[in-house]
């Protein structure tokens, strides 16, 4: 199944192995340098199938920057354990997150690099649980409220009630906002 990826070209890095969470968090510290432009999408992926790999290879054949990357992170441990309503974290059933990162240097080229990441994310829709990692969603003006709701999954309505109780004036709104009322 991984042969198409390996035949596409040599990876800059290959971390196909179990690793501690802290190591995962530090993997890209050096590569994500100061002055670079970024656009990130992170759909939750149910399974890495041959069709999913083919989709990835097809879109990387059209990549707009050699700095761009895509990484599958396997979800395990606390991210998948426990009832869905225990935390705000949605889509516990998804097995992977696909971190799609378009990275480039010249701010004037932003539109085409962002478009590439969005197109890859959209092409991956058939393989997802219907949501994305909330920290990698844009704001409502960019994403639309439906995508933000999908990011929180089944927890959204409960989070709206909590927001209405603890932040009824929507003071904390500069994020992937949950308004205090629907």
Each language-model region and where it sits:
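Soluble FAD-dependent oxygen oxidases
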Residues: 1-182
